[in-house]
A protein has these predicted regions:
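Glycosyltransferase-associated regions of secretory-pathway enzymes
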Residues: 2-150, 166-308
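Small-residue hinge/turn detector
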Residues: 151-163
Length: 308
């Protein structure tokens, strides 16, 4: 901050001298070049410092996650070899999955041939609820935003079948092996929150309770009927009417408000809120390799965000 202020003062003085013809044009150009060079290298230095600070922060967070996972209880059963993926057209038409995401799905199947792969479209989801969870069907239909419906379904599907859910824009990097199966529930890191991030209203409440990361739900896994999955499902189910009423007050053209609302009601913030309140945290394994938007070393979330 001091350097930026000093450089700003230098620039103002320089402009003053030029305006009053105290400096020659040649001298002014030289000083401008000096100022530009200082600014350039100052920003490069700041970027380097920020990168180092972020690297150190993520390393610390990695140690925090290791400590959390050290308390994990032994899984009574392993996560079943099931992979669930979903594609629903907003316009209600037949699935038109983008080519790159079809490749991710194909790669997922090739890397995990021993897994049962279940793909749901809009009609499949409707039938699933009508057949298995009629009490949740109304919630699914009533949730005000398209992505909320899909969020709700992914939680119910994993609660029902067990296995792993992956967004279509998640690129597999290596096969799911025994080490990932030997947990009762697995969630990745969505976002880390350093000291600067903690000033953001979205992250501040988590930082205040020492929760410096958000859990992701672009990919996760669990055994069937896992109690944490039940918490996610029932919390949305029980609050659906409140969500509907809040949504009515949101300006449809205000995308930022819609995104924030979704994050908090069915998205990563919602999952993190449930995790913070969940007493049996030792039932969950936090999958982290120090990076955001990854499923450990197994997959990377490309964050295409077509729902936005």
């Amino acid at each position: 901050m001091f350097r930026e202020s000093a450089l700003s003062v230098f620039g103002v003085v320089l402009m003053y001298l030029i305006y009053n013809k105290t400096l020659s044009i040649l001298a002014a150009l030289f000083l401008f070049a000096v100022l530009f060079t200082i600014l350039y290298y100052d920003r490069m230095y700041q970027s380097w410092i920020n990168a180092k600070e972020q690297e150190a922060f993520e390393k610390r967070m990695g140690e925090v996650v290791k400590e959390i996972n050290a308390g994990e209880s032994t899984a009574i059963e392993t996560i079943p070899r099931i992979i669930i993926q979903v594609w629903v057209q907003k316009d209600g038409g037949k699935p038109r999955v983008p080519a790159n995401q079809l490749e991710y799905m194909k790669k997922m199947r090739q890397m995990n041939p021993a897994f049962e792969h279940i793909f749901f479209n809009g009609e499949d989801i409707e039938q699933f609820f009508k057949t298995n969870y009629l009490e949740y069907y109304k919630t699914y239909k009533d949730l005000p935003f398209f992505i909320q419906k899909l969020d709700f379904f992914r939680y119910v599907a994993i609660y029902h079948y067990g296995g792993f859910y992956f967004d279509m824009d998640v690129e597999p990097l290596k096969p799911l092996d025994e080490s990932i199966l030997n947990h009762s529930a697995v969630f990745p890191i969505d976002e880390y929150a350093n000291s600067i991030d903690c000033q953001n209203p979205r992250m501040n409440s988590y930082c205040l309770v020492g929760q410096n990361f958000l859990l992701g739900q672009y990919a996760f896994g669990a055994v069937a009927k896992h109690p944490f999955m039940k918490v996610l499902v029932d919390t949305i189910h029980q609050n659906s009417l409140k969500y509907i009423n809040i949504a009515k007050q949101i300006n449809p053209s205000n995308k930022n408000d819609i995104h924030y609302f979704v994050y908090k009601t069915t998205g990563p913030d919602f999952v993190t809120d449930c995790y913070v309140k969940y007493k049996e945290k030792n039932q969950l394994y936090i999958l982290s390799n120090g990076k955001r938007q990854v499923f450990g070393d197994y997959a990377a979330h490309k964050y295409i965000g077509l729902w936005k």
